[in-house]
Amino acid sequence: MDGNDNSANRIRWNELPDVVRAEIEHRSGARVRAATTQPGGFSHGLAARLELSDGRDVFVKAIDSDDSLAAMYRTELETAARLPSTAPAPALRFSLDTPGWLVAIFDYVPGHHPRLDRPAELAAVLSTIEQLAATLTPSPLPDLPTIAQDYGPQLQGWRRFAEHQPPADLDDWSRRNLDKLAELESTWTDHAAGETLLHTDLRPDNMLLRPDGAIAVLDWAWPCRGAAWIDLVALSPAIAAHGIDTDRLLATHPVTSDIDPVAVSAFLCALAGYWAAKSREPAPPRSPSLRRYQARSARVTTDWLGRRLRW
C-alpha cells in the first residue's frame, strides 16, 4: 500500500521537445546539468529532479497538452499557485503553457516517502494532517467544488454491483452484504460537508519526509471542499495495511476524535466500493500497477470495514 511499486512509465527529460527544455532553462536561469526521474505515483507525465548548472535543484512536472491527464496537471498547478505559504507543500516557482506542453517547476524537496510502519514517520504524517486541517480551514480556495459534487458520482461501486451482476470473484462477505453496503455507501455525502480544502489523494508516495522531520504534501491534483476528517480517513486504509489499530488511531487523532463513527464507516464503505469497482477495469497502458494498487486497497478496506460493522 505504500506506493513503492506504483511507478508509471513516465516521460523522461530527454523526451521533451528541445524548445520546451530550452524554455525551462531560460526561465530557471541556468542550464540543466542532470535530470533524475522520480519514482512513485501513477501518472505517466514527466516528474524529475533537475540539477542546475548554478548548483540549485528544482522539481519539474510536465505533460503533453493533448494528453488525457493534462486537465489534472492544470488543476494541480493552479491549486499549487494559490496555496498559502503556511501550507506544508512545495512552492510553485513558475509554470509554462508552451508549444503543446504544460510545465510546472516547484521547489525541490529532499527526503523520502514516509514509511507508515515506522512510528516516528507515521507520527510526522499524522501531525501534518492536523496541520493541513488547521491551515486550510476555511478553504483558501472557496470557489472549488465540494467533495460531494466531485466524488458523489464516482463513489457508487457497491450500488453498481448491486444493480447489475456482481463480479464472479467478489469475496463472500461483500456478496452476502451487497445490498447493505450499497445502502451505507449512499449515505457518505450526508456527513462529508465542510469548508476545509482537501487534498483527497494522500498516499505515502504523495508525501516526502524531509531531513528536518517535516512532511511536504505533493500532487494537489484533486482538491475540493469538505469535512476536515476526510483526508485522514482516506489515508487510513494504507495505515491499516501495516496491522496498525486504525480504529484506535481515528478515535484519538484531533481531526477525527469527535466524528460520528457512522460517518467514518460510510466513507470507508464508499472508498472500498470505488476501489473494488475500479480495480476490475482494464489497466491504463502507461500505469500497469494502478489496478493492482486499487485491488489491494479494496481488500484492506473491505476487511477493516467488516470488522468495524460486525455484519
Describe the predicted segments one by one:
Residues 2, 112-175, 193-195, 224-225:
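A cross-family kinase active-site recognition segment
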Residues 39-52, 59-60, 183-230:
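Active-site acidic catalytic loop and adjacent metal/ATP-binding pocket
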Residues 101-112:
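Conserved short submotifs of the Hanks-type protein kinase catalytic core
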Residues 1-35:
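Juxta-kinase regulatory segment immediately upstream of eukaryotic protein kinase catalytic domains
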